[in-house]
Amino acid sequence: MFEKLFSPIKIRGMELKNRVMLPAMGTKFSGKASYVTDQLIDYHVARVKGGCGLNMVEVCSVHTPSAPRGFLSISEDEYVPGLKKLTDAIHAEGGKAGIQLSQGSMAVGMDQTAQILMASDMPMEIGRASCRERV
């Protein structure tokens, strides 16, 4: 059933060592400043060593003020060296890296520090507590 899972695959010139993919997540290992940290690098390197052929690196904000705290950013050139260091570490272990770009918007939820950007004004209700009858 899984004969091809651990076999290499070529996608438009990029060869993956297998078909195992780590989806993008928000580990919040980048801390409040949204930069790549050693903890984040270690996390992704461990996933490659564990067998992932492709790591989708985090939820990465294209507009830092609208991102939840602790999420990576790629909104300014100053973030690029850290992202390159992370990518190089993944490549050094034989993995490949991709990235999930995010603008934040309503996904920032209740993060009071985020400056939510949206395409247009949208009225929204503040949430309310749930009760046993609703659940």
Per-region residue spans from a language model:
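N-terminal amphipathic alpha-helix/helix-capping segment at the start of soluble metabolic enzymes
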Residues: 1-24, 90
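Hydrophobic faces of well-ordered beta-strands that scaffold small-molecule active sites
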Residues: 20-23, 55-57, 97-101
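Conserved, mostly hydrophobic/aromatic
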Residues: 22, 47, 51, 90, ...
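Active-site mouth loops of central-metabolism enzymes
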Residues: 25-39, 69-76, 110, 126-132
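Catalytic domains of carbohydrate-active enzymes, especially glycoside hydrolases
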Residues: 41-63
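Glycine-rich, proline-tolerant flexible connector loops at the mouths of alpha/beta enzymes
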Residues: 56-80, 101-114
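Alpha-helix-loop-beta-strand connector modules within alpha/beta enzyme cores
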Residues: 72-98
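Non-globular sequence segments
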Residues: 96, 102-132
